[in-house]
């Protein structure tokens, strides 16, 4: 198929069909499966090829104390899709955890990873995994690693962006696309955020920065604060997203405020045929933190002072685990104009496997420029790459 059609909003439809305020939507998979199945069925009839299981908020923390296990909820959700939409692919839908990761919050990267891994393990019998509405690149990475390391399913990764073109934590579509492509995602997308016209330029930026299929799931405009209704008609929604389809977006559906009627209108227009001229993917050497990207197409100044070679003070700081000193050196170099910082903690008596990832986290909590991880120890590099937020450069590794 030239296009795959996703479903629309589950929350909007549950509210329209009588879900009481304060209800945890995922519990309805067990307490009112007929209601959930009615939504799935209507999206399938409207033309959806892929239907999302009602698991967006299903995670160990949110379901704690409900009396239902994570596996029970997720398996019921998948069963509801299978029964109501047997001809559609079933996506395990994974949303944010609802907690900020370090350094913005208290949840560690590995703690986030373990929570996502539990969700993936509970839903491995879905046809694919969708990680969506993510606002933090670091949390998105934790979710994608969990999906890839705990299943063999294809993974669609979708972030949400604000009016300034950055995510809540400051990531751009370019950084998102380059990082998630490098981590092995199978499809990239943007969802929620705003209406389709707002998403089009952001989607074009994603298209230019990945060779992967790109997905769009916009809102039906903006909500009315008086009654919660959304501003766009189905015809205007389709008209608004059409330029993205013409530019190369091939996976499309709707988020907040969209209904089966929206998907039906979208399916009808796609069925008439769309002339597509995909924005070309720009191959380039690119490194980034979560906030700042550097295209390596010319000479770039790299700060080399985060290296213990012939630096007794730096060696002592490593032995003392004096990360404040490392951070001060990083800050001085960025203020002097370094575009990338080389980081090496290899010295006699130093456990690089432990120290390098910790140094990465400490420095990235303060400095925005990308890092170049410098080590001849593959295990240390692997540990550091795992916790790095963005797409780093790697230096000195032996083949």
For each feature predicted by the language model, list its residue ranges.
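Domain-level signal for soluble alpha/beta catalytic cores
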Residues: 1-399
């Amino acid at each position: 198929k030239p296009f795959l059609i996703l479903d629309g909003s589950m929350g909007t439809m549950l509210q329209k069909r009588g879900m009481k305020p304060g209800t945890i939507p995922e519990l309805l998979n067990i307490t009112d499966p007929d209601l959930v199945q009615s939504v799935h069925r209507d999206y399938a009839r409207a033309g959806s090829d892929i239907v999302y299981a009602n698991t967006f908020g299903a995670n160990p923390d949110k379901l704690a104390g409900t009396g239902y296990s994570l596996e029970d909820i997720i398996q019921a959700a998948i069963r509801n899709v299978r029964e109501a939409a047997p001809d559609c692919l079933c996506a395990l839908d994974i949303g944010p955890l609802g907690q900020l990761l370090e350094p913005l919050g208290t949840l560690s990267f590995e703690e986030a990873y373990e929570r996502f891994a539990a969700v993936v393990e509970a839903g491995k019998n879905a046809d694919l995994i969708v990680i969506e509405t993510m606002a933090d690149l670091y949390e998105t990475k934790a979710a994608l690693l969990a999906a890839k390391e705990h299943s063999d399913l294809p993974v669609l990764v979708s972030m949400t962006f604000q009016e300034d073109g950055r995510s809540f934590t400051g990531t751009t579509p370019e950084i998102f696309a380059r990082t998630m492509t490098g981590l092995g995602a199978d499809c990239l997308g943007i969802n929620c955020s705003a209406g389709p016209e707002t998403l089009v330029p952001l989607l074009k930026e994603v298209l230019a920065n990945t060779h992967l299929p790109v997905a769009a799931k916009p809102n039906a405009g903006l909500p009315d604060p008086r009654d919660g209704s959304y501003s766009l008609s189905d015809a205007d929604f389709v008209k608004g997203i059409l330029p993205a389809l013409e530019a190369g977006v091939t996976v499309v559906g709707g988020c907040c405020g969209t209904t089966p009627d929206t998907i039906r209108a979208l399916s009808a227009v796609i069925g008439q045929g769309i002339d597509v001229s995909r924005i070309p993917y720009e191959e380039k050497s690119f490194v980034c933190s979560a906030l700042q990207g550097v295209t390596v197409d010319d000479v770039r100044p790299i700060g080399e002072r985060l290296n213990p070679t012939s630096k007794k003070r730096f060696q002592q700081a490593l032995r003392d685990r004096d990360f404040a000193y490392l951070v001060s050196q990083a800050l001085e170099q960025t203020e002097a104009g370094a575009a990338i910082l080389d980081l090496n903690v290899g010295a006699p008596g130093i456990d690089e496997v432990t120290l390098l990832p910790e140094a990465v986290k400490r420095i990235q909590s303060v400095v925005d420029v990308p890092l170049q991880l410098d080590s001849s120890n593959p295990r240390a590099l692997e540990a550091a790459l795992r916790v790095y937020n963005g797409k780093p450069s790697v230096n000195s590794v032996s083949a």
